[in-house]
């Protein structure tokens, strides 16, 4: 009957959870007081559309609960304060068919990751949700998929994808200076980041990545000193030396005239005279 996903309140007095409808979609959010019977649980939000599903989470700065309701290409979000004794979710932006958005809060500001007037997404910023005044934070870019943000006390980290390559960018909050986070000399890799500690008062993060020639690796990375330390690496039982392989990045013209990126991985001893087999 429930989705299995729960959120504990910061005071550890309540549990927020969602209930499933007959189509196995989460459409109701309840609050359960620990120690009470479940028939006393409070319904705090209900999605009326059978096509939408709901979820609840806590903001990065732990000041708000956010309720997200969405289908495949449309979303809508509500919020209420961590300190509200009787939760009354308030609408952020009314849903609009084909528009996705996700609002997060950090350091007294609100960040909206949305495809409104931006096919490949953008990020807007506002000082308030009661009196919204959205201004550009990351503007839309031609053929660049703009990802969301991860917040630390001193840093904002975000992602971009262009030409089928993923990139990470780091912004120093105090200077507002942003630069690309380059942690490997491999151009073709798939990076991802995760928090190293919950309170976010740190300069260190975990960066995981893999590439066509390199097994999955996880590094501890210092955003201030830009130093890194390998903490985990996927073991290949048969043995593997990344230096034995060459990864090349080329582009070919498609039937519609667009250039399509192609990654070629080969052993450094492989002849490139057309005699070797190719797995495409």
PLM regions: where:
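Conserved loop/turn motif of beta-propeller repeat scaffolds
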Residues: 12, 62, 107, 153-155, ...
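Hydrophobic beta-strand positions that form the internal "hydrophobic ladder"
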Residues: 15, 65, 110-112, 156, ...
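Beta-propeller blade signature
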Residues: 30-36, 79-83, 124-128, 220-223
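Hydrophobic beta-strand anchors of alpha/beta hydrolase catalytic cores
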Residues: 277-279
């Amino acid at each position: 009957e429930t989705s299995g996903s729960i959120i504990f309140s910061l005071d550890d007095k309540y549990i927020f959870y969602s209930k499933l409808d007959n189509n196995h979609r989460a459409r109701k959010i309840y609050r359960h007081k620990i120690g009470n019977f479940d028939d006393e649980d409070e319904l705090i939000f209900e999605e009326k559309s059978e096509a939408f599903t709901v979820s609840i989470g806590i903001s990065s700065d732990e000041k708000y609960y956010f309720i997200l309701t969405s289908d495949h290409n449309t979303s809508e979000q509500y919020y209420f304060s961590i300190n509200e004794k009787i939760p009354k979710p308030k609408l952020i932006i009314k849903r609009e068919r084909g528009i996705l958005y996700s609002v997060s809060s950090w350091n007294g500001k609100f960040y909206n990751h949305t495809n409104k007037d931006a096919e490949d997404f953008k990020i807007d910023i506002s000082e308030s949700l009661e009196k919204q005044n959205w201004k550009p934070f990351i503007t839309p870019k031609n053929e660049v998929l703009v990802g969301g943000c991860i917040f630390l006390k001193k840093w904002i980290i975000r992602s971009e994808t262009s030409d089928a390559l993923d990139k990470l960018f780091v912004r120093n909050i105090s200077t507002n200076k942003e630069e690309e986070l380059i942690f490997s000399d491999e151009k073709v890799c798939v990076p991802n980041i995760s928090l190293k500690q919950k309170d976010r008062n740190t300069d260190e993060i975990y960066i995981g990545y893999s590439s066509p020639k390199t097994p999955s690796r996880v590094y501890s990375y210092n955003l201030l000193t830009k130093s890194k330390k390998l903490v985990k690496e996927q073991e290949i039982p048969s043995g593997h030396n990344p230096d034995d392989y060459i990864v090349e990045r080329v582009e070919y013209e498609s039937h519609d005239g667009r250039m399509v990126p192609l990654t070629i991985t080969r052993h450094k001893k492989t002849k490139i005279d057309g005699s070797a087999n190719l797995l495409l």
